[in-house]
Amino acid sequence: MTKGYKATYNYQCKTQIYEIGQEYKIDQIPILCQRGFHYCLGAKDTLYYYPFNPKFKLLEIEDLNPNDTVTDRHKLCSNHIKIIREIADPDELIQ
């Protein structure tokens, strides 16, 4: 399993709403920018895709199927993740 960070606005990305402790899975091979659950390996890297604002929520995730995960060096895309926790402390974001 791989640990990563997923940024959202109010726990939502497109039509998907995320909850702490829940798993999310699609039965397809992930494709960057098309389908799957996108995340970054570094917490601060998420700011490239989601600029900080009052609705910004940073989630620590586990990639539960890293064998099918695809990457472009900046972000990764999986077909199966689990939301571990919300990171509310800004100091954790910039480490």
Label each region the model flagged.
Residues 1-95:
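Short, glycine-biased loop/turn motifs at secondary-structure junctions and
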